[in-house]
Amino acid sequence: MAKLTVKDVDLKGKKVLVRVDFNVPLKDGVITNDNRITAALPTIKYIIEQGGRAILFSHLGRVKEEADKEGKSLAPVAADLAAKLGQDVVFPGVTRGAKLEEAINALEDGQVLLVENTRFEDVDGKKESKNDEELGKYWASLGDGIFVNDAFGTAHRAHASNVGISANVEKAVAGFLLENEIAYIQEAVETPERPFVAILGGSKVSDKIGVIENLLEKADKVLIGGGMTYTFYKAQGIEIGNSLVEEDKLDVAKDLLEKSNGKLILPVDSKEANAFAGYTEVRDTEGEAVSEGFLGLDIGPKSIAEFDQALTGAKTVVWNGPMGVFENPDFQAGTIGVMDAIVKQPGVKSIIGGGDSAAAAINLGRADKFSWISTGGGASMELLEGKVLPGLAALTEK
């Protein structure tokens, strides 16, 4: 990565502005999954160990109007972070003004401050989300010319708290998490050790058109599972019963199949049920076709065996999107089968592209077996598409 990183700058005695991704799930004010906080610790610890004063920025949820602020304060995050760091985290509870400035100016070397939810600035004219110039300049003025972007999860967005600050500081650098995300995902796609197999699941072809097109050029095989299977089936005239289908994407699916040169591998059977919820019958299909009155909710046992075979000997695997409705034990065999097939390959570099796949690996107890699990669903998807991420482009070149 030809961008400056946090190790390339002198931090001692400096007020260092840091964009982290603390967009964690909350239930009744309690954090239900703190992985994103844990993921940011190496960068925060490095800054304070080097004698810097860390000033952290993050969003939490979507905030469009005053009422949306309810339950979206970063206060629970400040408490969780303090416990993880073993030291106080200053939390003024505001995004601008004298209270914030005084708290920042009172910081000593090695201390940490968390600014309130950056999206609270969206209530008045979407200043954060629309990268308001004045807001970016103001936030940049709170530091000493160094900005560390460690929020991969928002790197595909041009917001005031990443691109806006970057434009108004002397040096904008990557944190360790951002550096790792780029290294794993970009290197896997651009310079993979072969055979390189991509596995794409999820419900919609429309979400993954760009990704499929890019990966058909780069990968040796692209395996398709999940709900989007049935759009590809229907495009070939295969019966899909009541399965999910995007009628307006049938031509796209047909086109992708035609230009794939046999690289695109579809399931050969499904696990079907007579309803999505409240079903009374679940069974495996004989072949590709889904029965009338039924819908496909997972790939079937023959497909699991075929995908296992397709993954044999793979040295690089990128997986994005579950094979079925994995939240339901009746339809998680496909996702489990594919995960197990990936991680058993000797010397494989295995990467999960965030989102539902990451949740599946964590919930089904296989997270620690993968080389890398991305923290950003949307951002990793755009990298897999070969797009330039605004948050990354805004960093200072080496």
Swiss-Prot record:
Substrate binds at residues 21-23, 36, 59-62, 119, 157. Keywords: ATP-binding, Cytoplasm, Glycolysis, Kinase, Nucleotide-binding, Transferase. Gene3D superfamilies: Phosphoglycerate kinase, N-terminal domain. ATP binds at residues 208, 296, 327, 354-357. SUPFAM superfamilies: Phosphoglycerate kinase. It is an enzyme of class 2 (transferase). Its main location: cytoplasm. GO terms for molecular function: ADP binding; ATP binding; phosphoglycerate kinase activity. Pathway: Carbohydrate degradation; glycolysis; pyruvate from D-glyceraldehyde 3-phosphate: step 2/5. It catalyses: (2R)-3-phosphoglycerate + ATP = (2R)-3-phospho-glyceroyl phosphate + ADP. GO terms for cellular component: cytosol. InterPro entries: Phosphoglycerate_kinase (IPR001576), Phosphoglycerate_kinase_CS (IPR015911), Phosphoglycerate_kinase_N (IPR015824), Phosphoglycerate_kinase_sf (IPR036043). The keyword Repeat does not apply. GO terms for biological process: gluconeogenesis; glycolytic process. Its EC number is 2.7.2.3. The keyword Cytoplasm applies. It is found in: Cytoplasm. Monomer. Belongs to the phosphoglycerate kinase family. This is Phosphoglycerate kinase. The gene is pgk.
